[in-house]
Structures are given as C-alpha cells and as structure tokens.
C-alpha cells in the first residue's frame, strides 16, 4: 500500500522536474536566439490570439512589425524610460528601492495594488510568461529577467520591449502604434507623441491613445517633464541606448 502511494508521487515529481528542465532549455534558447534575431511573437500576443479565437474572432491576427532601434525615434525610448523605469541604465533588472516602496504601499492599500516592475522584468514577462500575480509566475519572471540582463545589452532589452509592448487592443509594437495613431513611422515620433504612447502602457486596454482621458493627458504631461529632467535626447546617447 505504501509503495503504491509513493509511486504516483515519485512519478509526479519526476514529471514536474522534466517539465521545468524543458522550460529552462526552451527559455534559455529563446534568450540566446532573441539576442540577435527579431522577436516574431510574444506570450502576450499568443494569449490575445487564443482569446480572440475562443471568442469567435477568427480574423484577428496578433503580430508586431519589428523595427530596429535605429528606426525608432529616440523620444520613444526616452518616454518609456521616463514613465516606467528611470533607473533602467543602472540596475541589473530589479529596482530594489521601488520594490520596497511598492510593498509598503500595497500593505496599506490592498485595493490599489502598485507594481514596481522594471522594463527588463516587463520584457521577460511579456515575451515568455502568462499574465497574473502568482508567486510562481513572479519567480519565473525573476529568473528570466536575470537571464536577459546577463545575455542582452540594455539597448537590446529596450528594442525588444518597444517591439512587443501592447499600445492598444491588438496593437503590438511601437511601429504599429505610430502608424495607427499618428499615421507615421516610429522613427518620426516627436516628444509629445512618444509621451502619449508611454502614458497608456500601464493599461493599454483601458487607456486610449486615440481618445485620451484627462488622466492620460496629465500623465503625458508628467512624462514629458520627466523626459526633460533626464536630459532629453542626450540621455539616450549618454547611456548608449540609441
């Protein structure tokens, strides 16, 4: 009886270890491959695509029009750094002081959860993982973040982030966003347009770049002030990000 009980547990343990090993190889290979190859698809795109199919939207196609950093306005890179992660050039994937502040805030305000994810963490999550707040997902995100910070340059992380970020329902990547909202390529985005796109990133399915609310407009103005305080376009050059 005891052996019969132990055998299934041993099998499940071995199965779990094999699955984790396979995922590690898959993700490790992905990190190595995407350090030089354009990213054709992300986990978020896959999630949106499956949801569309399940909802009967068979004409929906989630994709991103990849562009290199040379074809992205420096204002756009600066805007997302100003909005999401001002210590991006300095840290190794995690902003510890920001995490501590977020934890303290969330303890006091359980109904209004604040995140502290860096651009590196967001890139790891959007590229490889499902959405959610489980400890398992956060643990995997941390490992993947360390992986891309080790293998990729900061410029590469920012390039991938801008190409897979969601800027609206079914609008993935800065090139698609620039074409949809401003009818121009990403290389021609100005400071105001870049700040507006960055302003919707916390929740691109709720906040609209083509119909910005008062909150989005105020956030856009705040981002522009932060961009100036960081030093404008010279910030990108100083940190070898363009």
Curated annotation (Swiss-Prot):
Pathway: Cell wall biogenesis; peptidoglycan biosynthesis. The keyword Transmembrane applies. One of its GO terms (biological process) is peptidoglycan biosynthetic process. InterPro entries: Glyco_trans_51 (IPR001264), Lysozyme-like_dom_sf (IPR023346), PBP_transglycosylase (IPR036950), Pep_trsgly (IPR011812). One of its GO terms (cellular component) is peptidoglycan-based cell wall. It catalyses: [GlcNAc-(1->4)-Mur2Ac(oyl-L-Ala-gamma-D-Glu-L-Lys-D-Ala-D-Ala)](n)-di-trans,octa-cis-undecaprenyl diphosphate + beta-D-GlcNAc-(1->4)-Mur2Ac(oyl-L-Ala-gamma-D-Glu-L-Lys-D-Ala-D-Ala)-di-trans,octa-cis-undecaprenyl diphosphate = [GlcNAc-(1->4)-Mur2Ac(oyl-L-Ala-gamma-D-Glu-L-Lys-D-Ala-D-Ala)](n+1)-di-trans,octa-cis-undecaprenyl diphosphate + di-trans,octa-cis-undecaprenyl diphosphate + H(+). It is an enzyme of class 2 (transferase). It is a single-pass membrane protein. One of its GO terms (molecular function) is pentosyltransferase activity. It comes from the Bacteria. The chain crosses the membrane at residues 19-39. The keyword Ribonucleoprotein does not apply. It is found in: Cell inner membrane. Keywords: Cell inner membrane, Cell membrane, Cell shape, Cell wall biogenesis/degradation, Glycosyltransferase, Membrane, Peptidoglycan synthesis, Transferase, Transmembrane, Transmembrane helix. Its main location: membrane. Its EC number is 2.4.99.28. HAMAP family: PGT_MtgA. Peptidoglycan polymerase that catalyzes glycan chain elongation from lipid-linked precursors. Belongs to the glycosyltransferase 51 family. NCBIfam families: mono_pep_trsgly (TIGR02070). This is Biosynthetic peptidoglycan transglycosylase. It comes from Salmonella agona (strain SL483). The lineage of its organism: Bacteria, Pseudomonadati, Pseudomonadota, Gammaproteobacteria, Enterobacterales. The gene is mtgA.
């Amino acid at each position: 009886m005891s052996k019969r009980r132990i055998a299934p547990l041993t099998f499940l343990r071995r199965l779990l270890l094999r699955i984790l090993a396979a995922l590690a190889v898959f993700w490790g290979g992905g990190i190595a491959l995407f350090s030089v190859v354009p990213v054709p698809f992300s986990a978020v795109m896959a999630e949106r695509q499956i949801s569309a199919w399940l909802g009967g939207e068979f004409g929906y196609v989630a994709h991103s029009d990849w562009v290199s950093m040379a074809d992205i306005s420096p204002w756009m890179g600066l805007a997302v750094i100003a909005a999401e992660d001002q210590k991006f050039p300095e840290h190794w994937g995690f902003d510890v002081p920001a995490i501590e502040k977020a934890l303290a805030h969330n303890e006091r305000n359980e109904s209004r959860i604040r995140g502290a994810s860096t651009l590196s963490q967001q890139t790891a999550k959007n590229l490889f993982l499902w959405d959610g707040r489980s400890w398992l997902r956060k643990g995997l995100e941390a490992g993947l973040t360390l992986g891309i910070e080790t293998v990729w340059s900061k410029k590469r992380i920012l390039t991938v982030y801008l190409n897979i970020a969601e800027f609206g329902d079914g609008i993935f990547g800065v090139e698609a966003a620039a074409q949809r909202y401003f009818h121009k390529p990403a290389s021609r985005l100005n400071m105001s347009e870049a700040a507006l796109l960055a302003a919707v990133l916390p929740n691109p399915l709720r906040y609209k770049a083509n119909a910005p609310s008062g909150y989005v407009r105020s956030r856009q103005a705040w981002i522009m002030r932060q961009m100036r305080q960081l030093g404008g376009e010279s910030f990108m050059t100083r940190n070898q990000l363009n």
